[in-house]
């Protein structure tokens, strides 16, 4: 990837990410108990977007992708693992207010710490060679599986919502939720794909690392 094109894409994405991140965190909502779950979901979404903004900022201002490939891969793997958890939690809790529990939160945090630690060990302690490549492949598979599992939970939650609305509400509401479910399929596939393409080194990274 050309550095100029890469920087332009980051420059275009950063303002949008920052705007929506702060908007989700700080915008006013009706002060009613019924909106509490919605507010928590929006705040989690805002935190996830600001976390991605911080990641993009490091790439944009310091060009870490072209200076230290291992550090860039580690930062992206760790960031996307955590963002998968945050985005999925924000979406699911809109449909299932009991989804967020202390046990689930601690499980995701512990998994994130283990994943990030193992990524650092593989990238900085293992010598370059077949073992490092196999280990990186295993971590990539872990990230893919984690993303797919979370995506499946989101899709199941939306399908459950469709059934509930079909049984209790008007047809137009059920159709809307069904459309939202289809949109969610594509959003999740796009998000997981972008995450993988971001941390996997391209030809520029490989040549930089070899130099």
Can you name each region flagged by the protein language model?
Residues 67, 126-134:
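Membrane-interface helix caps and helix-loop-helix hairpins in membrane proteins
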Residues 1-121, 138:
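N-terminal low-complexity or simple alpha-helical regulatory segments
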Residues 93-96, 123, 195-202:
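Hydrophobic alpha-helical transmembrane segments
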Residues 121-126, 159-161:
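Membrane-helix interface motif
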Residues 32-54, 108-109, 133-210:
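Alpha-helical transmembrane segments of multi-pass integral membrane proteins
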């Amino acid at each position: 990837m050309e550095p100029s094109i890469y920087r332009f894409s980051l420059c275009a994405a950063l303002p949008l990410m920052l705007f929506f991140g702060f908007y989700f965190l700080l915008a006013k909502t009706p002060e009613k108990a019924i909106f509490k779950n919605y507010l928590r979901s929006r705040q989690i979404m805002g935190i996830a977007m600001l976390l991605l903004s911080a990641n993009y900022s490091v790439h944009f201002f310091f060009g870490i992708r072209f200076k230290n490939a291992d550090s860039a891969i580690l930062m992206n793997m760790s960031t996307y693992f955590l963002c998968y958890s945050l985005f999925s939690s924000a979406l699911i809790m809109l449909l299932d207010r009991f989804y967020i529990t202390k046990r689930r939160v601690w499980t995701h945090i512990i998994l994130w710490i283990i994943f990030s630690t193992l990524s650092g060990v593989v990238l900085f302690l293992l010598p370059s060679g077949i073992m490092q490549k196999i280990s990186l492949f295993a971590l990539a598979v872990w990230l893919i599986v984690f993303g797919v599992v979370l995506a499946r939970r989101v899709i199941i939650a939306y399908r459950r919502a469709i059934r509930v609305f079909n049984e209790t509400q008007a047809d137009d509401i059920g159709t809307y939720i069904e459309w939202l479910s289809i949109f969610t399929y594509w959003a999740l596939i796009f998000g997981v794909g972008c995450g993988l393409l971001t941390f996997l080194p391209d030809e520029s990274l490989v040549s930089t690392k070899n130099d």
